[in-house]
């Protein structure tokens, strides 16, 4: 499943939303992930929440700090009473980004609340999930990756509903989409 568009801000699905899990849901993916606390989970464990996801690596010195800042900006702009929204940062460098490293990164970036989840998995699972998000990445040196800069929004049944592409872009539409999806939850 790859969702692509030429627009810089793209709507991936305008299909009717139901409480059942559609074939387009990430909750069907069998891959196992480990969070920053060392707990193993699957995507389906996040069912019922609006997910705001981005793929990064913690040793990145260029795009990832901006993506992290964009995620924090989006989170800070949500009304305080917004419920069932989880911000998920997925590592594209699972060899370096151990659960301990992810936890330290979360602390360094003031992303320690329950709404923040950091995940890592095998290279195969990471590549599969990157394909779902239409995120491309390639190791260009022992310590560096070239990668897409996309923040994805999933509804509470795991369907991709919106993507923000680029760094430091106006996040108004992203914030609005998250609020709309959270109100449906």
Language model feature labels by segment:
Residues 2-5:
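C-terminal motif of bacterial Sec signal peptides marking the signal peptidase cleavage site
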Residues 7-10:
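Bacterial signal peptide processing site
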Residues 12-44, 69:
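N-terminal "domain-start" segment that seeds a small globular fold
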Residues 43-65, 71:
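Short active-site neighborhood of thiol/selenol oxidoreductases, capturing the structured segment around
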Residues 63-78, 99:
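Typically the conserved alpha-helix immediately C-terminal to a functionally engaged Cys/Sec
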Residues 84-97, 114-126:
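Thiol-based oxidoreductase modules, predominantly thioredoxin-like and allied folds used
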Residues 103-148:
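Short, internal strand/loop/helix patches
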Residues 140-185:
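Thiol-/selenol-based redox modules, centered on thioredoxin-like
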């Amino acid at each position: 499943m790859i969702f692509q568009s030429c627009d810089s801000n793209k709507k991936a699905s305008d299909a009717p939303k139901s409480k059942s899990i559609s074939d387009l849901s990430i909750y069907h993916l069998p891959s196992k992930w480990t969070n920053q606390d060392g707990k193993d989970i699957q995507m389906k464990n996040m069912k019922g929440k609006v997910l705001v996801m981005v793929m990064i690596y913690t040793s990145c010195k260029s795009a990832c700090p901006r993506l992290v800042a964009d995620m924090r900006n989006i989170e800070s702009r949500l009304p305080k009473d917004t419920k069932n929204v989880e911000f998920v940062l997925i590592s594209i460098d699972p060899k370096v980004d151990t659960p301990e490293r992810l936890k330290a990164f979360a602390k360094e970036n003031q992303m320690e609340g329950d709404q923040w989840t950091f995940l890592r998995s095998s290279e195969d699972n990471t590549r599969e999930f990157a394909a779902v998000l239409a995120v491309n990445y390639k190791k260009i040196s022992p310590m560096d990756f070239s990668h897409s800069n996309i923040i994805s929004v999933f509804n509470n049944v795991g369907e991709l509903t919106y993507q923000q592409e680029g760094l430091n872009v106006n996040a108004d539409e992203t914030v609005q989409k998250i609020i709309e999806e959270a109100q449906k939850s």
